[in-house]
Amino acid sequence: MAVTESIASSGFPLGFKFRQGSSRPAVITGAGHGCFVAEARHFSAHHQKEAIVTEGEHGSSWRMTSDEGLHIKGDNLAPFPLGFFNAGLQADLAQRIRGLAQARGMTLSSLTLSCVTGYSMTGSFFQGNGVGAAEPAVIHVYGEGPVHAQAFFALVNEAVAASPALASMTQPLANTFALYLNGQRRGVTILPASTAPSAPDPLKTYSAPPAPLPGSERDLIVKTGITREGPIQIATPAAQPGAPIVRHVEGHCVTDLASGDSVTKICLQLPGMSEFALRTSTNGKDRAPSGLALLSAGVVFCYMTQLSRYIDYMKL
C-alpha cells in the first residue's frame, strides 16, 4: 500500500536546521555577494511542500515547510508562500537597521516593523490569459531610543538602500529557466533558458527526507493559534469579468536588538486565516535562517503552488 507523505507524517518541526555550514555569506549582514539555493518538493498531500534553503557556498541549510489555507483547499498546517516573502522583507530590513545603528554608534532600545504586501490577478490562470501583479510593499518602522527623529529617518533610508530583499521589488530581474524530466535536462522553448550548468538530481542528492540536526532549534516556524475573525470563504472567480482578485498579507516583526533574532508574525487578510510566526537570526551563532533565506523559500513555494494548481486543473 502506498504511503501518503505529509508535513505531519514526519513528526518534525515546521522548520529546522538541516545542515551546518562553516560561515554565513557576507550579504546577510552587510555588503557582499551570496548565492542562495532553494530546493523544494511537493508532498502527496495537495498544497503541502518543503524546501531546503542553503545560505551561500559555505552557509547552513534550513528546511522549511509551506501549505495553503482552507480557502484554496489546503490543510493550513504551515505558512503560505506569500507569507514567507513578507516575513523575509521585514527580517532583512530589520537586520540592516540594527547593523547600521551599531556601526553608527546609535542606541536603540526597541525596533519593530509592520508590512503589508499586496498581490492581484486578472484573467484566468487556467485559460492561459492570467496576469499577475504585485503592489508596492507598505512598511512602517518603529524605533525607540535616545536618537533624533531625523537621524533615525536617515538610518532607515540607508538600510532600505542596503537591503537585497527590498531590491528584489525595485530592480527588474531577468529570470531564466531549466526543465528536467526523469533526471534529464529538457529544452525550454517559451521561457528564457538558463545557461547555468545542470542542477544535481535531487533524487540522488537526498537519499532520505531531511531531519533536524541534533540540538537544533524547534521553534523557527510555529502556528500561533490565532485566527482572523469570520468564517473561511472558499476562493471563487472575480465577481465581474476582468476584475482583479486581490490578496493582502499582513506581517509584524519584532527584533531583539541584543541577540539579533527577529520574530515575524504573518497572516493573510481574509476571514478565518491562521497566523504563523517565523524566527530569523543574523548573529554568528547561526540559530535561525536569515530574512533572505525566508525570501528565497517564498519564491520557490509560490512557483510550486501554481504548478500544482495547474496539474490539478489539467488532471495530469
What are these regions (language model features)?
Residues 2-87, 98-297, 304-316:
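Extended beta-strand/beta-hairpin segments
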Residues 89-93, 302-303:
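Alpha-helical metal-binding/catalytic segments enriched in His/Glu/Asp
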